[in-house]
C-alpha cells in the first residue's frame, strides 16, 4: 500500500525542501505557528509555478475558532477563487456552528465554489473541535470531500490513534483520513499500522539562522518570545526519513 505524505509549509524555501524530501502533496499556509492561515495570492501563484506535485491552499481567514461571520465568509469565497486563479489543485477548509456541529449550509456553499473551479477539497482539523465526530464523518461524506485532516481529536495523531482507527472504519473508503499533528519518522509507521490511514500530514519543521549581518535583538516584529532572526523551515531530511521509515 502506497502511503501519501502531505507536507504543510508557510514559505517558499520550505516548498523546495518538502519537494526534495519526497512529499506527495503540499498544504500551503501562512502562519503555521497559528495553526495555518490563508496564504497570499502571490504565494499561491509562485507555489503553483514551482511545484510538480499538487498544492492545496489553506482557506482560514484568521486564527482562533471555526465560527465565521459574513465578512470572513466573503473572504473565504474570494480565496477559493484565488486558489484556482493561481493554478493550485485544491483547497483546505472547515467550518463549524456555535454548538460544534459542522456548518452544513456554509460547507456546501464553499464546496460548490470549489467544485465549480475544479478544486479538490480537504476538510481540516475543525473536526477535532466538533461536537460529535461520528456525525461529522457522515456530514463530510455527504459534502463529497476528498479527505479529512485530523489528529483523532487529540493533541497529536499518536495520542489519537484509537479515534483515527475508528474514523477510518466509519469513512469506509468514501474518503481518506489524513492523520496529522506531531507525525515524525519515529511514530509514522506505528500510526499507519494501528489506524489503517493511507495518508499522513506533517511539517518536518526545523529552523535556520537568519542570513542578516545586522542583528538588532531589541526590536521585535511580533510576539516577544519569537526570534526574528531564526527562520522556521521544513527540513527535507525529516520528510525523507518519514518516507524511508514507512516503505
UniProtKB/Swiss-Prot annotation:
What is the protein name given in its UniProt record? Answer: PF03932 family protein CutC
Q: Which Pfam families match?
A: CutC (PF03932)
Per UniProt, what is the name of the gene that codes for the protein in this document?
cutC
**Record keyword NADP present:** no
Q: Which InterPro entries match?
A: CutC-like, CutC-like_dom_sf
Which UniProt keywords are given for this protein, alphabetically ordered?
Answer: Cytoplasm
Q: Which domain of life is it from?
A: Bacteria
Provide the family line: Belongs to the CutC family.
Q: Where in the cell is it found?
A: Cytoplasm
Q: Name one GO cellular component term.
A: cytoplasm
| GO MF entries | copper ion binding
Amino acid at each position: 500500500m502506497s502511503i501519501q505524505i502531505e507536507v504543510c509549509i508557510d514559505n517558499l524555501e520550505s516548498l523546495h525542501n518538502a519537494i526534495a524530501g519526497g512529499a506527495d502533496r503540499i498544504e500551503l499556509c501562512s502562519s503555521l505557528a497559528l495553526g495555518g492561515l490563508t496564504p497570499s495570492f502571490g504565494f499561491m501563484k509562485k507555489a503553483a509555478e514551482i511545484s510538480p506535485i499538487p498544492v492545496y491552499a489553506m482557506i482560514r481567514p484568521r486564527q482562533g475558532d471555526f465560527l465565521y461571520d459574513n465578512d470572513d465568509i466573503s473572504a473565504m469565497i474570494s480565496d477559493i477563487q484565488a486558489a484556482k486563479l493561481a493554478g493550485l489543485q485544491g483547497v483546505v477548509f472547515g467550518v463549524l456552528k456555535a454548538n460544534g456541529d459542522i456548518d452544513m449550509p456554509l460547507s456546501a456553499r464553499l464546496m460548490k465554489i470549489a467544485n465549480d473551479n475544479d478544486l479538490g477539497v480537504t476538510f481540516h482539523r475543525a473536526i477535532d473541535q466538533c461536537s460529535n465526530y461520528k456525525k461529522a464523518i457522515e456530514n463530510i461524506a455527504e459534502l463529497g470531500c476528498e479527505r479529512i485532516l485530523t489528529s483523532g481529536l487529540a493533541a497529536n495523531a499518536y495520542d489519537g490513534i484509537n479515534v483515527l482507527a475508528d474514523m477510518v472504519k466509519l469513512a469506509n473508503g468514501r474518503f481518506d483520513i489524513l492523520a496529522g499533528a506531531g507525525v515524525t519518522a519515529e511514530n509514522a509507521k506505528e500510526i499507519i499500522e494501528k489506524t489503517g490511514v493511507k495518508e499522513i500530514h506533517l511539517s518536518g519543521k526545523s529552523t535556520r539562522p537568519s542570513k542578516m549581518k545586522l542583528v538588532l535583538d531589541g526590536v521585535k516584529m511580533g510576539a516577544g518570545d519569537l526570534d526574528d532572526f531564526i527562520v522556521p523551515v521544513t527540513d527535507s531530511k525529516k520528510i525523507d526519513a518519514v518516507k524511508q521509515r514507512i516503505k
